[in-house]
Each structure stands twice: as structure tokens, then as C-alpha cells.
Amino acid sequence: MRLWHRFVKFGFRRLYNEFAWTYNLVSRIVSRGNWHAWQRAALPELDGTRVLEIAFGTGNLLWDMTAEGYRCVGIDLSPQMARITARKFRQRGREAPICRARAQQLPFADGAFDSMVATFPDHFILDPPAQTEMARVLVPGGRLVVVDGGHILGGDPWTRLLNWAFTVTVSPRRSAGAGQQFSHDSFSVERRQVLNRRSRVGVLVAVRNEDELPGS
């Protein structure tokens, strides 16, 4: 199993970097076209106007939020994803509000954001130092919204295969959905399921406690 975990980690690293240009196609295939809808499940949970997206990927949700009037910033470690996102924004007449940064070292002031979003994040979302940083840059009462755990409805062989593949590739990265494991003293956590005609997806909403300082 450890060898499998290493193989999956290697594959995802390639997908996020050298093969980032295939990311949108791959995500559409493995989700049977539900990927963007799954990402957008975060939007109704946002509060305020200042939003940070962690690991923005190819920038689809970052663009959606910007187009809807949110004052967004996105961070990602992948130069290839940054180039794809920057090009997407330029083609639409905007500069991409992005920078390269780690969740464990966010280059923003305390209370800089009203909401934060991460869709299908890697293991960093469960890292206590990253969670402390996320709490630090959120205003008291601010929201961290995490979308995770997509599941396609239906019992046909292709759907069963995709759901199985999603489980065995995502699980090695986090052991379980972030919505089931996320825990930090600075946050009060709620977990929800968003259902549409073809699929369901998990949404975690972690509200920054007003009387709890990060690191205290």
C-alpha cells in the first residue's frame, strides 16, 4: 500500500506541474462533467467580499468569484497552474490576482480576508501550522470553505469505476475526506452534503471563532 501511495503522489505531482495543461480535461472525465459544479458548491457559503483561494489550480473558481464581484486573491505552488490562470484572466481582460505561497506561510496580514476557499485540497488542509495560518488571516467570524469528497450518482459500471478510482487516488493523499478530519481550536466546523441531479459533494464550513486567537 505504501508503494501505491507513492505512485499516486508522484502522479498528482506531475498532473499539477508538467501536465497541468491536461488538468481540466482529466477532472471533467473523472467527475463525469461535475467538477466545476462541485467547485461552485463553495460559493453559497462565502461571507463578505475579501476571499482567498488556496491552491487555485487552473483558476476556474477564482475567475467565477472575481466575475461575481468578490475581491479575490489566489495562491498556488505550481508555476504551470499560475501560467494557465494568468493566461485565462488576460484573455478576459483582467490581471490574475495570484501569487506563489504555501498555506503554512501565508504572506498576508492578520484578518486580511472574510472568507477562504479550497476545493479538493491536498494534505496541507489537515496540517496544524497551515490551519493556524488560515485562522490568522481570517477575520473573527470569517469562513473557511472546503469542498471535498465528490461522488457520482448511478450504478452503471463506468460510474462505479470512477467512484472507486476517485476513492483510491484521493484517499492516499488525505486518508479520508478533509471534511471528516478537519479540526482546530480556532474553528467551529460544520459538514454538509450538496446534492444535484447527477452527483453529491461534501462541503465543510469552518467558522473562525471570535474569542480564539490562532496559536493561543
Predicted feature residues:
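Conserved class I S-adenosyl-L-methionine
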Residues: 1-46, 60, 64, 159-166
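A short acidic, Gly/Pro-enriched loop at the edge of an enzyme's catalytic core
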Residues: 104-116
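C-terminal alpha-helical "lid/dimerization" subdomain adjacent to the S-adenosyl-L-methionine
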Residues: 10, 146-202
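Class I SAM-dependent methyltransferase SAM/SAH-binding core
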Residues: 52-54, 58-105
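A short glycine-rich, Lys/Arg-flanked "PGG" loop and its adjoining helix->strand segment in the class I
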Residues: 129-140
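A short SAM/SAH-binding and catalytic strip from SAM-dependent methyltransferases
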Residues: 115-128
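C-terminal lobe and adjacent flexible extensions of AdoMet/dcAdoMet transferase-like proteins
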Residues: 204-216
